[in-house]
Amino acid sequence: MKPLIVVKFGGSLTKNTKAQKEFLKELSKISQKQKIILVHGGGPEVSFLLEKFSIRSKFVNGLRFTDEKVLSVAEMALSGKINKNLVAGLLKNNVKAVGISAKDAKSVICKQVKNLGFVGDPIKVNKKLIEVLLKENFLPVIASIACDNKSNSLNVNADTLASVLAIAFKAQKLIFLTDVCGVLDRNKKTIKEIKVKNVNYLIKDRTITGGMIPKIQACANSIKKGVKEVWIIDGLKGVIEMKGTVVKK
């Protein structure tokens, strides 16, 4: 089998039609040489729909508090609109893409996170469905909606989801696409390399804040559990250029 990479696409890139189109074109080229699992979130689209439906939501340490109404909107946006838009874009580039959520076939089972509502923390990956898709040369496009042991939907952070899948499938590389040039220092300059041992310090001294916290924690966890290379890159610069921050052991 070709070497596997896991790519996480999300943030405001999901609302940038031009950037998304270019990204999918690049991904189609990469898919000729490597197996790919594409994981996506879509926070801005979820926020847009929540505002449209006059539903309030809040964030706790970069993670969205998810009540029943928020969960319903999140599942609609992630498993529906965003997932199928990405699949359509890949199909147009002659990639055999299949859109699923992490809930399908109980691919990722989570435990509910305290104080965050219907938010899940992955505890088990069932690889069968995704393995079948990869073996048959399909590119899985996976929305960040998972489930608990009783098949109840849970909103799972897409960075965390990408990390656990990269670990489970022993990915050669994990790439997080963002709308910034990687992790920035206090002078807004890109930190080109971060050692895992320094991650907690960078969070404590507030160099890393907000939505970048779960992202960098996912990077560190992936490296600790065997993924060789993890990148946080500027999606606007493209996957091939790899402009951003690399996290290493």
Where in this protein do the model-derived segments appear?
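C-terminal catalytic "cap/lid" subdomain
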Residues: 1-249
